[in-house]
Amino acid sequence: MMIQLECLSVTYPGGVQALQAVSLNFNPGEFTVILGASGSGKSTLLRCLNGLIQPTAGTITIEGYRQINDPKVLHQHRQRTGMIFQQHQLIARQTALQNVLTGRLAYHSTVRSFFPLPKADKYIALECLDRVGLLSKALARVDNLSGGQQQRVGIARALAQQPRLMLADEPVASLDPASSHKVISFLRQICQEDGIAAIMSLHQVDLAKAYADRIVGISQGRIVFDGSAADIEECELNRIYGNAENIHFDDIPSNQYPIASN
């Protein structure tokens, strides 16, 4: 077991409960999809896993004994946690290679980051681009790439961190179906080959059923399903989506999050 969440709860200012007593385990090489309606708590869960939000109650333990509320453990955890965003968060005027190299900055001091990175880091970045099928685009500016290619650069950047955990927050929401399948296929293959625990939030049930080893359904901050993709049926989907309220936790301004300290 790599990560354990025990009775995790998050309450935002005003008393809005984004997560309620969530207990989950995640294992190396496991490809998990979090399904839920907008405002169900999916993104809050991912932010907790990355240490960006401090839970109101409960614990997050990695490697069986280290809790990420310890600042030193949290720093090490973030260093080895790759994050893939819905809006890829790339630097448009830079090349694909330059963007992927930013994934290596966590391994260098702030002062060192102002200077060219070592050749070893460039080799790692090029290998990551090759693994997502974009080695030939290494020197292309990312604003000249398609949306699907840009998201694959985002995967390569996260992979350059040499992560043990990969988090993806609605990574294909803005892509067409063909690009969505390609992006998730690359991500799943890489994580399984490298033994990386992958946790991805999605809206698309068809993609979850096609690629997930495990699906976790969340509704109003509570876990309502946890099982294999083959086990999820219409009744489970009704439990996940049928009772969602029109509350969008992801729209709460970031300055109102219960943010964790560095």
UniProtKB/Swiss-Prot annotation:
Annotated ranges, domain ABC transporter: 3-245
Topology within the bilayer: Peripheral membrane protein
CDD domains, alphabetized: ABC_PhnC_transporter
Cellular component GO terms held in the UniProt record: plasma membrane
GO molecular function: ABC-type phosphonate transporter activity; ATP binding; ATP hydrolysis activity
Catalyzed chemical reaction(s): phosphonate(out) + ATP + H2O = phosphonate(in) + ADP + phosphate + H(+)
Subcellular location: Cell inner membrane
Pfam families referenced in this protein's UniProt entry, alphabetically: ABC_tran
Taxonomic superkingdom: Bacteria
Entry keyword set: ATP-binding, Cell inner membrane, Cell membrane, Membrane, Nucleotide-binding, Phosphonate transport, Plasmid, Translocase, Transport
Residues bound to ATP: 36-43
Entry EC number(s): 7.3.2.2
InterPro entries, per the entry: AAA+_ATPase (IPR003593), ABC_transporter-like_ATP-bd (IPR003439), ABC_transporter-like_CS (IPR017871), ABC_transpr_PhnC (IPR012693), MetN_ABC_transporter-like (IPR050086), P-loop_NTPase (IPR027417)
Disulfide bonds: none
Quaternary structure annotation from Swiss-Prot or TrEMBL: The complex is composed of two ATP-binding proteins (PhnC), two transmembrane proteins (PhnE) and a solute-binding protein (PhnD).
Function: Part of the ABC transporter complex PhnCDE involved in phosphonates import. Responsible for energy coupling to the transport system.
Family as reported in the entry's similarity comment: Belongs to the ABC transporter superfamily. Phosphonates importer (TC 3.A.1.9.1) family.
Protein name from the UniProt record: Phosphonates import ATP-binding protein PhnC 3
Gene designation: phnC3
